[in-house]
Amino acid sequence: MSSAIYLENYLDGLESLPTELERNFKLMRKLDDRAQTAMKSIDSHAKDFMRKLGENGAMSEDERRERQEDIKALFGKAKEYSDDKVQLAIQTYELVDKQIRRLDNDLARFEGEIQEKASSTRAKSEEVVAKKGRKKTKDSKTTGKKKKSASSDEETGRGNNQSNANSSVNSSSNAGQGSKKKKSKVNQEKETRKGGAQKKTVEVDDSEKESCHTAATHPSDVMDMPVDPNEPTYCLCHQVSYGEMIGCDNPDCPIEWFHFACVGLTTKPKGKWFCPKCTQDRKKK
């Protein structure tokens, strides 16, 4: 129920209250006047009774008893008027108290509804933040997998190119060695035919062997994959998103997302979580 409906219902209940209070106050005033009139009459009768009672032989026994009964009746009337006035005052008090209790109950009910709505809104807000955190973590994992896959493909391509280069170098080296060996054998046969000269052993150039061996056995180191300069950075380490991350529940947090390891977490904590900077700022307040 909205506050406007509460107010409207309460004003409807108060609409007849002034009329009832006015009627009760008028009756109380009339009863008070009657009681005061009775008390004045009692004073007058009492003075007259005491005056005649003081005179010797001025009042008979029957007259004295009659005057006493009259004074007693006046006292009864005054008491009746006073009792009616007290009852009417109690009734008026209960009438006002009823409206006050009704207002208190309506206010308590209205406050309960406000707190319930606030709790519901807070729960929905936390659920939205949690969903954003899970989505951010999922996107971070997907981005990390894509980067690893791209890096692996690039390393594989460079490895294949290096292998092809090494194979070409080895083939060239082997071909050179074969041709030189053939020349050596031809020269040796010629020397033998000419007069039995000693055979020459033709050695392959050591520098060529060393260069071929180095090219075949020491491929170039794989370079690190370059980082996209346009990718946003997070956390206290100012690095890109990777692995498990947690979001700060302070909506004004300048960093917003943090790596678990950088803030000393292994699992997501229950309830709200604030980063170290926001925690210090909250303590200062």
UniProtKB/Swiss-Prot annotation:
Residues 160-178 have a biased composition (Low complexity). Its main location: nucleus. Gene3D superfamilies: 6.10.140.1740, Zinc/RING finger domain, C3HC4 (zinc finger). Coiled coil: none annotated. Keywords: Chromatin regulator, Chromosome, Metal-binding, Nucleus, Zinc, Zinc-finger. Zn(2+) 1 binds at residues 235, 237, 259, 262. It is found in: Nucleus; Chromosome. This is Inhibitor of growth protein 5. It comes from Drosophila melanogaster.
